[in-house]
Amino acid sequence: MITIKIGGSVVDNLHPTTISDIKKVAEQEGVILVHGGGKEVTKVTEQLGKEPKFVVSPSGIKSRYTDKETSEIFTMVMSGRINKAIVQMLQKNDVNAVGL
């Protein structure tokens, strides 16, 4: 089993070569694909009229401040929009995929 992490910027422009590479790996061993999508979460949050909030740790790491409403938006975007689009692309390319 191998885990592959693709960032939100890759998700935004998922190239056919990336799908092909994932397919090749999946044919050899099981794959868990983890995706980002923070920019899309921010975009949808703003479209819904809510201002995104972020916090910065003492070491300089920026993180999204997630209240209940933001958590619901995050879930909607990540598992509803992004996850489903990735699964659809993988399945169109004969990769057996399910989104969780």
Where are the language model's segments positioned?
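Nucleotide/pyrophosphate-binding catalytic subdomain
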Residues: 1-100
